[in-house]
Amino acid sequence: FWLKVYEIPVASRTSKGRPLVNMLNLDDDESVSDILPVSEFSENEYIFMATKKGTTKKTNLSLFSKKYKSGIKAINLDEDDKLIGTAITSGEEEILLASSAGKLIRFNESHVRPMGRTARGVRGIRLKKDEKLISLMVGDPSKTILCVSENGFGKKTKLDDFPSHNRGGQGAVSYTHLTLPTT
């Protein structure tokens, strides 16, 4: 779905606001997973998506340029899967996926080919049976990332400390003896 900001009603600081379901034509089994600000639907930009089961998908942003009242299908999901995160990318970004086991994989977005809107996607990270993907990040290799555990422990780590691999691996350990939130 997409909604122009001026279509959202202005409200006072203390007002409750208006439910998004009243502004979007969501089905009963649908919910809002993420919100992306888009000013123009460029041919040179992509929407990068990641699911709970470690699947990733890259779709050209221009494929979402037409507005439909019933929304536009962005990804096909299995019954027990759900969208964890989305990002607008250039096609050459560094992608980071973090798992509930404290592992993080870093790979270049170019390892994921552009797909149509209804495609399922490809494996971004290999997860064990009880693991889930908990975060999708797009990062600059010269920057640092902040990792925070469910128990409130946090640390900053240089992105370069995580080796860049091909997509589909298990990733490197970013946290040990850690309980991360499950979604």
PLM features: residue spans?
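Surface-exposed interaction/gating patches
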Residues: N44-T56, E93-K103, K128-P163, L178
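Short loop/beta submotifs within extracellular cysteine-rich repeat domains
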Residues: W2-L3, T55-T59, S65-K69, K103-F107, ...
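Conserved small/polar residues in nucleotide/adenosyl-binding loops
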Residues: Y175-T182
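A general structural motif
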Residues: D78-E79, A87, R126-D130
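Duplex nucleic acid-engaging cores and interfaces of nucleic-acid transaction enzymes
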Residues: F1-L63, K67-Y68, E79-D80, I84-G85, ...
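Conserved, well-folded catalytic cores of nucleic-acid-processing
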Residues: A11, L26, K67, M115-G121, ...
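Acidic/polar low-complexity surface segments
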Residues: G71, G121-R123, G169-S174
